Amino acid sequence: MKVLLIKDVKGLGKAGEVKDVKDGYGNNFLIGKGLAKSATDAVLKQYEAAKKRAQEEINYEINQNEKLKAELENIKIIIKTKLGANGALFGSITKDEIANALKEQKGYEVDKKALECDHIKATGIYDVALKLKHGISAKFKVEVAGE
């Protein structure tokens, strides 16, 4: 009996592979536990169509992330904060403040956990990286100025 593995099965194969197994093992264990489906022509066509759709979605996400990267690399956000007597910041600029400024000034809503930057404890211009999906990373400028 031929089965299409839905999940990885130790000692047999990985998800998406078609394997030839004994009828009892295929029907009772693999199909019974939801690890595989009987590899009929209809099931294989359905699997290939789903695989193609998933790849198209990934390509679309990559394309959107590349566009976002191109947009972000041309912007600079400004964060104004109070300064001490010697011109130093009170505390430091947090990733949350950067994410809020990016949303308020440019309209991009990002997760603060996706931001990568050094501790910002002085005025100046800093590079901040935003990690996007599929290994894409965008850098933009953050200017910290006193009020």
Swiss-Prot record:
GO terms for molecular function: rRNA binding; structural constituent of ribosome. GO terms for biological process: translation. The keyword rRNA-binding applies. GO terms for cellular component: ribonucleoprotein complex; ribosome. Gene3D superfamilies: Ribosomal protein L9, C-terminal domain, Ribosomal protein L9, N-terminal domain. The keyword Aminoacyl-tRNA synthetase does not apply. It comes from the Bacteria. Keywords: Ribonucleoprotein, Ribosomal protein, RNA-binding, rRNA-binding. Signal peptide: none annotated. It holds the Pfam family Ribosomal_L9_N. Binds to the 23S rRNA. Belongs to the bacterial ribosomal protein bL9 family. This is Large ribosomal subunit protein bL9. It comes from Campylobacter fetus subsp. fetus (strain 82-40).
